């Protein structure tokens, strides 16, 4: 009967402490088969062993859960822990004995060891195995890349949270990661924004010269050499749902047509679609990030629309003003059939300001008459009214009433003549 009772006590001790049979027999015999005292002494020795520092070197990478060495190993003076062969841990089911309830499981590892934990379902995890497989913990977030462990930059980070019976995986969006990397690369190779050249504070007049006839004078070669190409500015705005170029439409990150564009931006290169025809013109690209979705801007309203009309102009003349004003000022229509300019004879230029706002510049000989000038105007406006007057530019204006008077006699050589109805 005593043997059966001792056997039950040994089994209960093993179920509570997960120790070996030899250890259970040793502690029970030391306490005259008092189970409570034997378990208390066993756990106290376990806590004392855990509090002792390890002066010889780093602890083994993994430890067992409530495990114990055999007496032949733990009490032998030649025994040293092995890093390559950790003692196996024992998982057990709930003890049927009611006396096992007050006791819990404790780790046998040292204070500095990488400890394994065991949840009630028997699933174990270890820091030494945190990189095994695809399982990662929150401790990996604080680990720097200098540990020599490569990370796949093409895969999004996955975070796990939850308990024993439920869990959740959170994966960050890859496009946000790509935008972050793009901005990081842009910061590394960024250049200062070009400073606009300060304008001179001088109030002296500068500009291009023009003749009284209206013809523009080409600038001098020195001025042309001093002119530098103007810098082209582009702004690329990154939104949560895409990106825009300047004031263009929204473009998606995953669109295959935008792959080449995004690759050029990530390499800090100007995209081909933004390059000017003249390669000498510098291009500056600004990257702007907005933490919101793109919304279509309202279209600008143009409440004032219509056709300009000149005061004192007839209906037929004013109606053709928009069409006539689009013609260049220094381009004259074909001369009338009776007007022939002799290049060998003295010539002059006359600027004609018509009533509809059109400016015509034509060349005449000095022997041409005022009638020839009117014929030139009538030829340029076949459907226009011929009831008009010609006035010279000046104060007071002089009316040209003598049609047979030559240009030289009328004093309108290289002058401006105004048409008035």
UniProtKB/Swiss-Prot annotation:
User: Any idea where the SEP domain is?
Assistant: 231-295
Q: Which regions are flagged for Low complexity bias?
A: 85-102, 312-328
UniProt region (Disordered), positions on chain: 46-171, 292-338
UniProt cross-references to InterPro entries, sorted A to Z? C6orf106_UBA-like, NSFL1C_SEP_dom_sf, SEP_domain, UBA-like_sf, Ubiquitin-like_domsf, UBX_dom
Q: Which residues form the UBX domain?
A: 343-420
Q: Where is the UBA domain?
A: 4-45
Domain of life of the organism encoding this protein: Eukaryota
Q: Which UniProt keywords apply?
A: Ubl conjugation pathway
Feature: compositional bias, Polar residues: 69-84
Q: Name one GO cellular component term.
A: cytosol
Show the GO MF annotations.
Answer: ATPase binding
Assembly and partners are described as: Interacts with CDC48A (non-hexameric) via its UBX domain.
Q: What is this protein called?
A: Plant UBX domain-containing protein 5
């Amino acid at each position: 009967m005593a043997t059966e009772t001792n056997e039950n006590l040994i089994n209960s001790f093993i179920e509570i402490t997960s120790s070996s049979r030899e250890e259970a027999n040793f502690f029970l015999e030391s306490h005259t088969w008092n189970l409570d005292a034997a378990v208390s002494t066993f756990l106290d020795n376990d806590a004392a062993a855990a509090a002792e520092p390890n002066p010889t070197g780093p602890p083994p990478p993994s430890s067992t859960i409530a495990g114990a060495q055999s007496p032949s190993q733990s009490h032998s003076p030649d025994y040293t822990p092995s890093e390559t062969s950790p003692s196996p841990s024992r998982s057990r089911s709930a003890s049927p004995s009611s006396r096992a309830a007050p006791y819990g499981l404790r780790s046998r590892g040292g204070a500095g060891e990488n400890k394994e934990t065991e949840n009630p379902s028997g699933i174990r995890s270890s820091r030494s195995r945190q990189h095994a497989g695809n399982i990662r913990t929150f401790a990996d977030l604080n680990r720097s890349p200098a540990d020599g462990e490569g990370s796949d930059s093409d895969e999004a980070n996955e975070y796990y949270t939850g308990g024993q019976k439920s869990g959740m995986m959170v994966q960050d969006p890859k496009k946000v990661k790509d935008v972050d990397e793009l901005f990081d690369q842009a910061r590394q190779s960024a250049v200062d924004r070009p400073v606009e050249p300060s304008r001179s504070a001088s109030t002296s007049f500068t500009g291009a010269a023009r003749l009284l006839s209206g013809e523009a004078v080409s600038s001098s070669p020195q001025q042309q050499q001093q002119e530098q190409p103007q810098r082209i500015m582009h702004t690329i705005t990154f939104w949560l749902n895409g990106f825009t170029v300047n004031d263009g439409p929204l473009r998606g990150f995953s669109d295959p047509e935008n792959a080449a564009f995004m690759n050029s931006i990530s390499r800090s290169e100007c995209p081909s679609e933004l390059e000017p025809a003249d390669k000498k013109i510098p291009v500056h690209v600004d990257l702007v990030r907005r933490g919101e979705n793109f919304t279509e801007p309202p279209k600008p309203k143009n409440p004032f629309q219509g056709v300009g009309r000149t005061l004192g102009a007839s209906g037929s003349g004013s109606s053709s003003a928009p069409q006539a004003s689009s013609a260049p000022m220094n381009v004259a229509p074909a001369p009338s059939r009776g007007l022939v300019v002799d290049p060998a004879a003295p010539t002059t230029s006359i600027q004609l300001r018509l009533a509809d706002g059109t400016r015509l510049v034509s060349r005449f000989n000095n022997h041409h008459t005022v009638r020839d000038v009117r014929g030139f105007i009538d030829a340029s406006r076949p459907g226009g009214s011929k009831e008009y007057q010609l006035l010279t530019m000046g104060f007071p204006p002089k009316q040209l009433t003598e049609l047979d008077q030559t240009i030289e006699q009328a004093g309108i050589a290289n002058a401006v003549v105004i048409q008035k109805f």
